[in-house]
From Swiss-Prot:
Record protein name field: tRNA(Ile)-lysidine synthase
SMART domains per the UniProt record, alphabetical: TilS_C (SM00977)
Cited InterPro entries: Lysidine-tRNA-synth_C, Rossmann-like_a/b/a_fold, TilS/TtcA_N, tRNA_Ile_lys_synt, tRNA_Ile_lys_synt_N, tRNA_Ile_lys_synt_subst-bd
Classification via Gene3D superfamilies: 1.20.59.20, HUPs
Reactions catalysed: cytidine(34) in tRNA(Ile2) + L-lysine + ATP = lysidine(34) in tRNA(Ile2) + AMP + diphosphate + H(+)
Domain of life of the native organism: Bacteria
Family in the record: Belongs to the tRNA(Ile)-lysidine synthase family.
Role: Ligates lysine onto the cytidine present at position 34 of the AUA codon-specific tRNA(Ile) that contains the anticodon CAU, in an ATP-dependent manner. Cytidine is converted to lysidine, thus changing the amino acid specificity of the tRNA from methionine to isoleucine.
Compartment list: Cytoplasm
Binding residues annotated for ATP, in chain numbering: S25, G26, G27, L28, D29, S30
GO cellular component, one term: cytoplasm
Enzyme Commission number(s) from the entry: 6.3.4.19
The keyword ATP-binding is assigned to this record: yes
Amino acid sequence: MNTLDIQRHIADRLAGRRRLLVAFSGGLDSTVLLHALVQLRASCLPHLRLRVVHVHHGLSHFADQWVDHCESVCYLWQVPLHVLHVQVDTQRNSVEAAARDARYQAIAELIDSRETLLTAQHLDDQCETFLLALKRGSGPTGLSAMAQSMPFFVCEQLRPLLDISREQLTAYAQVHDLSWVEDDSNADARFDRNFLRMRIVPLLRERWPHFSEAVARSASLCAEQEQLLDELLMESLQALMSEDDALSIDGLLPLSEAKRYALLRRWIACFGVMMPTREQLQRLWHEVALAREDAEPQLHLAKCQVRRFRRRLYLLPTLRSLRDEVLRWDPHQPLTLPDGLGELQMGSRGVCVRAPTPGEAVTIRFCAQGVLRIVGRRHSRAIKKIWQELHIPPWERERTPMLYYGESLIAALGVFVTQEGQAVAGATMWNIHWSKDWM
């Protein structure tokens, strides 16, 4: 594939997309991609609107020099450059994954909803990704490796070089006398991807010269099989999901294990969560779905958790405990609740309760215990039973503001008022409104 072939290949992959945000590290791959786009804009695609983004991770001593290089290149080629600085969580097991997450989150905040994000992964990257998935014991989803096109937050990510080898990109760069930076970490064989690129893939290609192309075909076939399964299982999945995206356990029970796990995977994929391992799926089913009826089981997946309530599975963000929070409140002023739960304020609407006596301190908490009687009920009940009878899921109980006067529970706002808090005719009453930013 010569220079013009590569440019034509990229033009074909663009397929009418005209507003592009190019991820530019300054390395060989993204340099070739950006150069080809600039050439296309100058020759046959004058309506291309290019922007470039470079992410400074702060992980290398050379990071500032890379920024300088990218600025010089973009100035020369007359494309606007945005440099984003991110903080990478170096305490995570994989610094590479942490850097990728931080990079994509920063780019997501920059990209315009009408733009397409272009990244420069190529054929050899695809081969390495496939082998890494194979090493992890992945199924067809993981072995599909990287897609040519995929959703990126509210936009789209396109990889137009995925069929082009590193060798072809190097030849292109040499023909056009391009300069690029070398990431010093790419020479560190302690990283799995580098180990594959430096030691394993060259050995495989020495024996089988077209090994990377064969791997790419296998990845493509796996992706086709997954797409077919998605289409075949979509109707079944929709039948099992409620309006709040919960998944019916009873609907999964009579199914074969293979179909049940396939549906669980696709349900999880609906939330954009990293695909669970087989062991995690087995734990989800046996430890959460099939836990004893009086249990409140949960399983953490990446930054989410799977919970069960009333014979349904729910996938939720991981929430910090608020059990120890005690917020003093002057009800004549709005109160901002923690964790984005909204705001409390007095007004003409909301929960109606008696006003406190002069000696009663007003606080907001997020837990309650013991036995109490709520307005509208004749008998006292354990609060856990009350929650269950009102069909309030455990995770919502833990994030419902509880109004206390002294040590007396007055109301679970938006849910119930206790006998202690009942407004009596002729007495001073308060209306407390909870403006929710969640649920």
